[in-house]
């Protein structure tokens, strides 16, 4: 934030207007100094919360909208990548509504839908999560419904390749402030919603979760910061390795060579193995 282009304070955060930055890891695995994103994306206004098309050539971003004698609101813009540069953002028209806020874009992994947050009419109160088709658009605007949205605020959606939806909410039962939730659709078409609990969630605001490889990723939180500033955290759920050994014997305590062994997990998994010649 301190290195952002704008000189004014954000009407949303109260700090200096935000720009978009990127950072890479060096050969030792340490994060390098953040650099402003290349091109003409950053301006005097607030830029934040981005998502990319599956091919990485289109960026969807949240951008502040300022009008005289009105509260600061946000809109969704797009930028396209040509070579190493991002183009100047262009407003992405979702509806003709010029009064409501539109932000927190999240492109589905297949590139079919754009999920976003809005307080437009037709919701369930506060800010709701909506989606619209990126390929058809006309007539595809859809509120995610009462199972996801509450009279409170639902924000920062993120879609994984398996269809699971992650979002932050202060309307679902949580630990305090904004909590991160996981929503999985069952075979009947209903969302099953799960609070991510500690250590992902805290009594502060926890939001903006994204995933990288397997069960690792990043999220933001203002926990433990007396100034209320947001910090980026990383997380990883390590895989669990279980070593099982034994010997297959018959009623006479003799080893059974080439015996078929079934390992059944409580998640329904069923693995077939064969014993050695000595029954082990």
Where are these regions (language model features)?
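Short, conserved micro-motifs composed of acidic
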Residues: 1-247, 251-260, 272-278
């Amino acid at each position: 934030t301190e290195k952002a282009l704008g000189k004014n304070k954000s009407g949303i955060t109260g700090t200096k207007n935000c720009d978009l930055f990127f950072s890479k890891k060096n050969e030792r695995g340490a994060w390098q100094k953040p650099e402003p994103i290349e091109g003409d994306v950053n301006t005097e206004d607030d830029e934040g919360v981005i998502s990319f098309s599956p091919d990485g050539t289109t960026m969807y971003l949240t951008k502040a909208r300022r009008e005289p004698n009105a509260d600061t609101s946000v809109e969704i813009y797009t930028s396209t990548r040509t070579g190493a540069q991002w183009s100047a953002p262009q407003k992405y028209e979702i509806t003709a509504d010029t009064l409501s806020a539109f932000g927190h874009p999240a492109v589905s992994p297949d590139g079919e839908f754009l999920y976003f947050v809005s307080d437009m009419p037709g919701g369930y109160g506060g800010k709701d999560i909506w989606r619209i088709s990126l390929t058809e658009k006309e007539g595809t605007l859809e509120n995610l419904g009462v199972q996801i949205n509450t009279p409170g605020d639902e924000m920062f959606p993120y879609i994984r390749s398996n269809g699971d939806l992650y979002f932050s909410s202060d309307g679902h039962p949580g630990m305090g402030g904004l909590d991160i939730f996981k929503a999985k659709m069952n075979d009947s078409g209903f969302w099953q919603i799960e609070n991510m609990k500690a250590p992902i969630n805290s009594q502060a605001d926890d939001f903006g979760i994204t995933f990288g490889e397997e069960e690792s990723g990043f999220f933001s939180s203002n926990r433990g910061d007396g100034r209320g500033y947001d910090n980026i955290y990383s997380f990883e759920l390590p895989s669990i390795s279980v070593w099982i050994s034994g010997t297959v014997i018959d009623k006479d305590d003799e080893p059974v060579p080439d015996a078929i062994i079934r390992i059944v997990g409580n998640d329904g998994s069923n693995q077939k193995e064969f014993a050695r010649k000595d029954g082990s």
